[in-house]
Amino acid sequence: MVFNRLTKVLILPLYYLLHHNFIIGLIQKFLIKNFYYKDFTFFLNIRNIPLPNYSSFFFRTYEYNDRKIIERNITKKNRCIVIGGGIGFIPCITYKISGNKLIIFEINSDLISNLNKNLISNRCKYKLYNENLVIFKSEKLKKFYLTNDFLATSSRIITNKFIKIKNLYFKKIKNFKKFNTLIIDAEGDEQYYIKNIKYLKNIKHLYFELHHNIFGKKDVEKIMKNLKKNNFKIKDKCFNSFYFRREI
């Protein structure tokens, strides 16, 4: 949903108290260290986690929106491709529920070692690519901008630091057509995949976080219009995270 003024007034104070708390962040980083959720353990051996952000691990509000729609909707019928592996939180939950091998993309090389460690320790079956998934063969490299927050590597939020990532054409991925679910947390690149979703005929289920800090009202309207055009209907949402299913 698009946050209106009333929503911001009600939600933002609670968000910063639980999800962005400096004092709790200190406790989590130096005393607890790892992130524990249900029977999962996640190591946080990553640079550039802002100290207040550690409180989201303490209160288990990390990736709350995405987690909710994944836990409510993923089943053993889903064979998932995850864009944005992060610390492995969403991939691990997805694998635990579906039981099916994952394809995971993570463009930030600094996260790969920690991500692999978490996926292995939580007994996931997966194929991990330190590349950028693209729809068109002609796309060779893509520029992504870096920030002081490991969560905010983006092609859309411009900073003075950037990396160029090798693109991987989707048709070069073995058994790609057998995967029916796309899960996207890509700091604005959800627009790219949704814009070109017509080329991914095998994708029947689409989960994504919509970044309102990047997209204006007209951009959001175009995204929703394109989903409708390609027979995707909304089935669930939690704040700015959505689940759409293709209905033919």
What annotation goes with each model-predicted range?
Residues M1-C124, N175, D219, I223, ...:
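S-adenosyl-L-methionine
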Residues D39-R67, I135-K174:
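Glycine-rich adenosyl-binding loop in Rossmann-like folds that engage adenosine-containing cofactors
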Residues P91, I112, S138, E190-Y193:
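Short, well-ordered alpha-helical microsegments
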Residues T94, L115, F144, Y193-I197:
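Hydrophobic packing residues within well-ordered alpha-helices of enzyme cores
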Residues S98, I103-I104, K171-I248:
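Conserved acidic-Pro-Pro-aromatic motif
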Residues I120-N122, F144-F150, L200-K201, M224-N226:
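Short, hinge-like loop/turn segments at secondary-structure boundaries
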Residues K125-N132:
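Conserved SAM-binding strand-loop segment of SAM-dependent methyltransferases
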Residues N132-K137, D185:
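Conserved acidic residues
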